[in-house]
């Protein structure tokens, strides 16, 4: 908490710790506020561990803006412990995706859990986000809704790009 109050840990990376603590203690699903769910699909909510997987990236296993887990999930506990150890020792953020890199290490440690998880790419869930700065196209919108029922709408990089466009 001290490093967060001193602004050494920013809001984004503090929320990584918060999401892990809540999921480890209570289980359930963490959904960032920037996510739109257009259709309920039980497979995303009723698993011991679920997150959208990253395609063609050996360093980042998947996204952390939507995670379902059981209580005391070992992958999340390992990720949390590694993050606390990192922040105990460090005064600066070495990589924006530190959560994802440590998450990748943790899931490799428990690879059998990862292999049992439903395989959903994080690419289709970003389609809508990429269209937000363009003129509305109903055909494309229908296509996107058919491709995914969960949509990640914003991220920090997108917000800065959008701000630049409207300036």
Regions found by a protein language model. Give the residues of each.
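Glycosyltransferase-associated regions of secretory-pathway enzymes
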Residues: 1-16, 33-167
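Small-residue hinge/turn detector
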Residues: 17-28
């Amino acid at each position: 908490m001290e490093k967060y109050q001193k602004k050494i840990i920013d809001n984004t990376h503090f929320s990584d710790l918060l999401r892990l603590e809540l999921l480890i203690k209570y289980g359930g699903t963490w959904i960032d506020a920037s996510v739109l769910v257009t259709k309920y699909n039980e497979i995303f909510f009723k698993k011991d561990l679920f997150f959208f997987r990253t395609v063609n990236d050996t360093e980042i296993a998947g996204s952390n803006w939507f995670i379902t887990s059981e209580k005391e999930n070992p992958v999340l506990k390992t990720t949390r412990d590694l993050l606390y150890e990192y922040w105990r020792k460090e005064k600066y953020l070495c990589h924006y995706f530190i959560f994802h890199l440590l998450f990748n290490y943790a899931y490799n440690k428990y690879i059998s859990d990862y292999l049992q998880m439903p395989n959903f790419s994080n690419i289709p869930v970003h389609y809508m986000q990429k269209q937000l700065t363009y003129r509305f196209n109903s055909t494309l919108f229908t296509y996107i809704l058919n491709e995914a029922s969960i949509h990640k709408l914003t991220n920090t990089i997108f917000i800065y790009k959008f701000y630049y466009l409207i300036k």
